[in-house]
């Protein structure tokens, strides 16, 4: 079982963007589901990852990702987030999977995206760094589900080839 931190309402404070947040860990608490788009971006024999500058998991690494804005097409949101966070222009190629966890209001939609332009650079205040890592030599990942997502992606590579 996954240990889910579920703060009680009295433990909430106003977060950096005005939304309620856990006073212990800083995680934003949403009252309704929020859609997050993420990208696995193959590049130079590895995948692009960002080092988080915000909670949860400051200093740990994950995929370029972000919230989908109201009225925004999901694929466009993923392409926007990769550009904002990594300086890379990408085209979303295919769906890797949909992910959700009990006790978490986030619905995570992960795509594979192909680099079409730009320059790899940390271009966003939400990240400390951006790098390409070999699948066999990953840094400390921000979220438990990241390894499962990578496994799903690698498994899907076998069916595409």
Describe each PLM feature range.
Residues 42-84:
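Conserved Nudix-box catalytic region and its N-terminal flanking loop in Nudix hydrolases
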Residues 38, 46, 129:
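Conserved beta-strand and immediately adjacent loop positions that scaffold enzyme active sites
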Residues 68-153, 159-161:
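Unchanged
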Residues 30-31, 57, 102-104:
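Short glycine/serine/proline-enriched coil/turn segments at secondary-structure junctions
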Residues 3-38:
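Acidic, metal-coordinating catalytic segment for phosphate/diphosphate chemistry
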Residues 41-42, 49, 113, 132:
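Conserved hydrophobic "DFG−1" position in protein kinase catalytic cores
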Residues 24, 52, 65, 113, ...:
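Active-site donor-binding loop signature of nucleotide-sugar glycosyltransferases
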């Amino acid at each position: 079982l996954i240990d889910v931190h579920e703060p009680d309402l009295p433990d909430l404070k106003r977060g950096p963007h005005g939304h309620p947040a856990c006073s212990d860990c800083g995680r934003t608490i949403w009252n309704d589901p929020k859609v997050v788009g993420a990208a696995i971006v193959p590049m130079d024999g590895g995948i692009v990852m960002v080092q988080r500058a915000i909670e949860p998991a400051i200093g740990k690494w994950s995929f370029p990702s972000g919230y989908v804005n109201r009225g925004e097409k999901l694929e466009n949101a993923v392409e926007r987030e990769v550009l904002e966070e990594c300086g890379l222009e990408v085209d979303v190629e295919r769906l890797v999977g949909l992910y959700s966890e009990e006790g978490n209001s986030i619905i995570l939609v992960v795509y594979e995206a192909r680099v079409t332009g730009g320059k790899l650079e940390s271009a966003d205040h939400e990240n400390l760094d951006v790098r390409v890592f070999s699948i066999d030599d990953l840094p400390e990942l921000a979220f438990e589900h990241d390894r499962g997502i990578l496994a799903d992606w690698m498994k899907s590579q076998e069916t595409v080839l």
